[in-house]
A protein has these predicted regions:
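Short, low-complexity disordered segments enriched in Ser/Pro/Gly and basic
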Residues: 452-458
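Cytosolic Rossmann-like ligand/nucleotide-binding regulatory domains
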Residues: 466, 470-517, 521
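Alpha-helical transmembrane segments and immediately membrane-proximal extracytoplasmic
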Residues: 1-447, 456, 465-466, 490-493, ...
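Short, compositionally biased
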Residues: 521-532
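Short, solvent-exposed amphipathic alpha-helical segments in soluble enzyme
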Residues: 409, 478-480, 526-527
Length: 532
C-alpha cells in the first residue's frame, strides 16, 4: 500500500510538471509571436533606411554619368576631381574614427552576432555607414550596395533590440533579421536574404533565426518593390539553348572549370592586394588621390564601369558586344579597378563587382560558344546569368544564396537547373583548389588586424529552445569544452545560480569562453540550445 501511495504521488508530480511545462511552453509561444512581430518592424525600418540608400546611389550614379556623357569643357573636370578627392579623404577620416563602418559590412555583422564585436554607438555608426557608402560610391569607385545594406540592417536590429528590451539570447535573431532585410532591400530578394544569413553570417540553420530573417526580408523587399517597381534584371531577355544532353554537360563542365580557376585567381588577387595595400606607408590622402585618379580615368573611358559596373553588366546582358577581345579587356579593367576599390577599406561591398565579373566572364564563354557554333548569339545572356551565379559560388562559397538570388532577381527560372549543376561542380572544384570564402577571409583579416581591440574572454548568450539538446539538462551534468563555463541563467526576469539549475525552454544562458574559441564554439553551442 505504501509503495502504491509513493507511485501515485510520483505520478501526480509528473503530471504537474507536464502541466507547468505545457503552460510555460505556451507562454514562450506568445513571446515568440512578439519576436516575429518585432522582426517585421525591423524589416520595415531597414527598408526605410536601406531603400533610400539604394535610391541615392542610383540617383548619384546617373548624375555622374550624365556629367561625363555631356562632354563638358576640360576646366569643369578640375572641381569635380578635387571634390571627389576631398570626399574620399573625409570618408577615410570617418573610417579611422569608426573602423567598423569600413568595408562591406558582412564580416562585421557576423562578428556582432557571434559576440566578438559590440555596436557601442549603433545609430551614429549607422548614419556614418550610410553617408560613407554614398560618398564612396559617388566618387565612382567599384563598390557594391549589398554589404552596407546588410550592416545597416544589423544596426537597425541592434537599435530595435535596445528599444524593445529584447532578451540577450534573442538579440542575435533581430541582428540577423536586420541583416537579411538589408540584402532584401538591396535586391528585392527576400528568399535569398534568408539564405545569406544562414550560409554566410550565422553559418547554420536555427529555425527561429530563419523565420525572423524571412519575415523581415519580405517586409523590406516589399518596401524596395514600391520604390523600384521595375527590376532592371527583369528586362534581360533569356533564350535557353537547345543542345543534346551530353553536349550540354560538356559545356557546363568547361564553364565550371573556367569559373573555378578564374574565381581562384580573383580571390587570391583580392586577398594579396588587400594585404599589400595595408602595408603601404603613404598617407591616406595620397592613397585616395591615386584611387580617384583611376576612377576618373575609367569614368572618361566608360562611365558605366564605375559604381560597381552593374549598369555596364545590364547593358551587355540586354544588347551586348560580340567582340571577345574587347569584352575580355573590359573585364580585366573592371577587375583591376575593383581590386583597388575594395582594398581601400572604404564603405562599400564587393558583391556586385563580383557579380559583374562573373557576368562578363560568362559573356566571354558564351561568345566563344557562338564562334564555334555550340550556341546562338541569343543564348549569350543565358550563359551570363548562369556564370553570375557560378562566380558567386566560387568566390563567396554560398551556393544556395547564389543560385536563388540570380533566379529571384531575374525571374528566369530556366537558369535554375544549369545554375545548380554548374554551382555544384564549382563548389567541388573550389574545395580541391582549397579556396576560402571571401567573407571568411575578410572576417579573419578584421579580427587579426593590429588595431582590433580583443578581449581575453567573451560571453555568448543563447536561448534554450523546446526539445533542444540542452532542454531539461542539469547545468552540473553538462560537459562543456575546456575553459568554457555557464556563468548565468536568466529566467522570468531573475538571474539564477547555474549550479544545480535544470535548463528549461526560454532560459537565457550566458556562456563564457576564451576569445580564440568563439568562432569554433559558436555554431555547436547555439545548435545545442536551438536545434531540435
Amino acid at each position: 500500500m505504501e509503495l502504491w501511495d509513493k507511485a501515485e504521488r510520483l505520478w501526480t508530480r509528473v503530471k504537474n510538471w507536464k502541466t507547468v511545462r505545457g503552460w510555460h511552453i505556451w507562454k514562450l509561444k506568445l513571446v515568440d509571436a512578439r519576436l516575429y512581430f518585432v522582426s517585421m518592424f525591423v524589416g520595415l525600418l531597414t527598408g526605410l533606411v536601406a531603400v533610400p540608400y539604394h535610391y541615392l546611389l542610383y540617383y548619384l550614379f546617373h548624375l555622374r554619368s550624365g556629367f561625363f556623357a555631356s562632354h563638358p569643357a576640360w576646366y569643369w573636370h578640375i572641381p569635380l576631381f578635387l571634390f571627389s578627392w576631398g570626399i574620399l579623404v573625409f570618408v577615410m577620416w570617418l573610417v579611422g574614427k569608426m573602423p567598423l563602418i569600413g568595408g562591406g559590412g558582412i564580416p562585421q555583422t557576423r562578428g556582432v552576432i557571434n559576440g566578438r564585436i559590440t555596436y557601442r554607438h549603433p545609430f551614429i555608426e549607422m548614419v556614418s555607414k550610410f553617408v560613407g557608402g554614398i560618398l564612396s560610391f559617388s566618387a565612382g569607385l567599384s563598390l557594391g550596395r549589398e554589404g552596407p545594406s546588410v550592416q545597416i540592417g544589423s544596426y537597425v536590429g541592434s537599435l530595435v533590440s535596445r528599444w524593445t528590451h529584447i532578451l540577450k539570447g534573442e538579440q542575435k535573431q533581430l541582428l540577423a533579421a536586420g541583416a537579411g532585410a538589408g540584402l532584401a532591400a538591396a535586391f528585392a530578394a527576400p528568399l535569398a536574404s534568408s539564405l545569406i544569413v544562414i550560409e554566410s553570417i550565422e553559418r547554420f540553420d536555427a529555425p527561429k533565426t530563419a523565420i525572423t530573417t524571412l519575415l523581415a526580408g519580405v517586409v523590406a523587399g516589399a518596401v524596395a518593390s514600391m520604390v523600384f517597381p521595375v527590376n532592371p534584371y527583369h528586362l534581360i531577355e533569356v533564350t535557353e539553348p537547345v543542345f543534346a544532353f551530353f553536349v550540354q554537360m560538356k559545356y557546363f563542365l568547361i564553364l565550371a572549370v573556367i569559373v573555378s580557376v578564374c574565381g581562384k585567381f580573383y580571390s587570391s588577387t583580392m586577398n594579396a592586394f588587400r594585404h599589400v595595400y595595408a602595408k603601404v606607408n603613404s598617407p591616406a590622402y595620397v592613397k585616395m588621390l591615386y584611387l580617384v585618379l583611376v576612377a576618373y580615368i575609367i569614368s572618361l573611358m566608360q562611365v558605366n564601369l564605375t559604381g560597381g559596373g552593374e549598369q555596364f553588366l545590364l547593358a551587355q546582358a540586354q544588347n551586348g558586344s560580340t567582340q571577345i577581345m574587347w569584352v575580355t579587356a573590359v573585364m580585366l579593367l573592371h577587375f583591376v579597378f575593383s581590386v583597388f576599390s575594395v582594398s581601400s577599406g572604404l564603405p562599400g561591398g564587393s558583391f556586385i563587382p563580383t557579380l559583374v565579373t562573373g557576368g562578363l566572364l560568362g559573356q566571354i564563354v558564351g561568345l566563344v560558344g557562338v564562334r564555334y557554333g555550340v550556341i546562338g548569339q541569343e543564348n549569350v545572356s543565358y550563359i551570363m546569368l548562369v556564370s553570375m551565379s557560378a562566380f558567386l559560388v566560387a568566390v563567396v562559397r554560398t551556393p544556395l544564396t547564389a543560385i536563388v538570388l540570380i533566379t529571384e532577381i531575374t525571374g528566369h527560372f530556366e537558369v535554375f537547373y544549369p545554375s545548380v549543376v554548374v554551382g555544384g561542380l564549382i563548389y567541388y572544384f573550389t574545395e580541391l583548389l582549397q579556396m576560402k570564402p571571401s567573407n571568411v577571409s575578410l572576417y579573419e583579416d578584421m579580427i587579426h588586424a593590429p588595431d582590433f581591440k580583443e578581449e581575453k574572454r567573451y560571453t555568448l548568450s543563447v536561448e534554450i529552445m523546446t526539445d533542444s539538446y540542452l532542454d531539461g539538462k542539469l547545468v552540473d551534468e553538462l560537459s562543456l569544452p575546456e575553459r568554457c563555463a555557464i556563468i548565468n541563467v536568466h529566467r522570468d526576469g531573475k538571474n539564477l545560480v547555474p549550479a544545480g539549475t535544470r535548463l528549461i525552454p526560454g532560459d537565457q544562458v550566458q556562456i563564457e569562453m576564451d576569445s580564440q574559441d568563439i568562432e569554433k564554439l559558436y555554431e555547436p553551442l547555439v545548435s545545442m540550445a536551438n536545434i531540435y
